[in-house]
Amino acid sequence: MLVKADMTKDIAQVMAEVGRKAKAAAAPLSIATSEQKNKALNAAADAILEARADILEANRLDLANAEKNGMAASFVDRLTLNEARIDAIAEGIRAIATLPDPVGEVIAEWDRPNGLHIERVRTPLGVIGVIYESRPNVTADAGALCLKAGNAVILRGGSDSAHSSAAIYKALVKGLEAANLPADAIQIVPVTDRAAVGEMLKGLGGAIDVIVPRGGKSLVARVQSEARVPVFAHLEGICHLYIDKSADLDMARRIALDAKMRRTGICGAAETLLVDRAVASTHLAPILGDLAAGGCEIRGSAEVLALYPAAKPATEEDWSTEYLDAIISVALVDGISGAIDHINRYSSHHTEAIVAEDAQTVARFFNEIDSAILLHNASTQFADGGEFGMGAEIGIATGKMHARGPVGVEQLTSFKYRVRGSGQVRG
């Protein structure tokens, strides 16, 4: 149960105990069999479906608070659970259960001239701290992915989704118990006080091995600034879609509409549309017309306004804004070179897409843009661990160390070397 504060212990004591329990659970979990972990995951999926009514009721409490606090529509969308989304959460957990177990996988092996046989083998990271905001589904995704990779996890969701996350967490614990795995392998921070985040960022006395923040720019900035343990950083998704002069117009229209409007509140939603100046007179109006008809606000450069007067003027700030809403900024560029320059200047290095038929243009896009995910002739909304066949993701890392792109079960492991000899000494 979540409480505002514990009157008998201060926050540091509460969190130290959480860390101690996680560390103790990590050891047996690291050697759990694939069968045990999969049994726990499938049992957790069953428990989520069985608790559907309780989860929806908990979510209604969170939604009522969000409405009371005047939260934005995009925030409410991320917070909302319904029958279909609960089904998807359970299906996502089952999909994770079907994935190959990464723990113990031999990544590489070789023999040395002296007869030593060396293997590089995947191992769990240990204890992972996940700090997130309004997405209650992250409770399930993060818990399930960490379990599959043999890691204990400490979950700290935002107070806005506290009731929903707590209801989902109960189902995850039932899964652990069904497989005779330590119940403390998945823990939810039992207090809503923000000081708990600060304690996690300090590492809980060496208990936490890595922090994964999943939320807005201010959350990620705080984590990166204060963390004393490694961080898988997930910055905002300032995602670009570039329509090249070689693009098929019908394809471009379908992709642009989906990339922006399928779900506007996710990090893979396109925030900026770039159109090759060479085809602006034929391609711009149909694409923007589709977006406007779908309820999207268009913010354009002066050139865009001249061709599409219904647009609003874009400011310099628009090019570096993650809207997470039905708003898109639009500019014309001088072909692929102009697109590359614009993207590399304003991108958060999350996801970019190109619609083009010219192979050399696509090759330049792939080679010269430094973002975690690059797509050709596909919507930016495929920037998702589930769509990558990972079952789910704990986030999309935009940094370059250890994990980049969707963080799935493989990215939640480290490795060690096993060296087998027959009496060799260096002498």
Swiss-Prot record:
The keyword Cytoplasm applies. Pathway: Amino-acid biosynthesis; L-proline biosynthesis; L-glutamate 5-semialdehyde from L-glutamate: step 2/2. It is found in: Cytoplasm. This is Gamma-glutamyl phosphate reductase. GO terms for molecular function: glutamate-5-semialdehyde dehydrogenase activity; NADP binding. The lineage of its organism: Bacteria, Pseudomonadati, Pseudomonadota, Alphaproteobacteria, Hyphomicrobiales. It is an enzyme of class 1 (oxidoreductase). Gene3D superfamilies: Aldehyde Dehydrogenase, Chain A, domain 1, Aldehyde Dehydrogenase, Chain A, domain 2. NCBIfam families: PRK00197.1, proA. One of its GO terms (cellular component) is cytoplasm. It comes from Brucella melitensis biotype 2 (strain ATCC 23457). It catalyses: L-glutamate 5-semialdehyde + phosphate + NADP(+) = L-glutamyl 5-phosphate + NADPH + H(+). The keyword Amino-acid biosynthesis applies. Catalyzes the NADPH-dependent reduction of L-glutamate 5-phosphate into L-glutamate 5-semialdehyde and phosphate. The product spontaneously undergoes cyclization to form 1-pyrroline-5-carboxylate. Its EC number is 1.2.1.41. GO terms for biological process: L-proline biosynthetic process. SUPFAM superfamilies: ALDH-like (SSF53720). CDD domains: ALDH_F18-19_ProA-GPR. Belongs to the gamma-glutamyl phosphate reductase family. Pfam families: Aldedh. PROSITE patterns: PROA. Keywords: Amino-acid biosynthesis, Cytoplasm, NADP, Oxidoreductase, Proline biosynthesis. Transmembrane segments: none annotated.
